[in-house]
């Protein structure tokens, strides 16, 4: 099976960007509580 590198990159970005966004919001909320 041929692996499409662009597809892998697209999936990686699609997963990592929202995850990073949620982590940033989570950290912001914690620092505000402190």
Curated annotation (Swiss-Prot):
It holds the Pfam family PsbM. It is found in: Plastid, Chloroplast thylakoid membrane. Keywords: Chloroplast, Membrane, Photosynthesis, Photosystem II, Plastid, Reaction center, Thylakoid, Transmembrane, Transmembrane helix. Its main location: plastid. The chain crosses the membrane at residues 5-25. One of its GO terms (cellular component) is chloroplast thylakoid membrane. SUPFAM superfamilies: Photosystem II reaction center protein M, PsbM (SSF161033). It is a single-pass membrane protein. GO terms for biological process: photosynthesis, light reaction. It comes from the Eukaryota. Signal peptide: none annotated. HAMAP family: PSII_PsbM. One of the components of the core complex of photosystem II (PSII). PSII is a light-driven water:plastoquinone oxidoreductase that uses light energy to abstract electrons from H(2)O, generating O(2) and a proton gradient subsequently used for ATP formation. It consists of a core antenna complex that captures photons, and an electron transfer chain that converts photonic excitation into a charge separation. This subunit is found at the monomer-monomer interface. PSII is composed of 1 copy each of membrane proteins PsbA, PsbB, PsbC, PsbD, PsbE, PsbF, PsbH, PsbI, PsbJ, PsbK, PsbL, PsbM, PsbT, PsbX, PsbY, PsbZ, Psb30/Ycf12, at least 3 peripheral proteins of the oxygen-evolving complex and a large number of cofactors. It forms dimeric complexes. Belongs to the PsbM family. This is Photosystem II reaction center protein M. The gene is psbM.
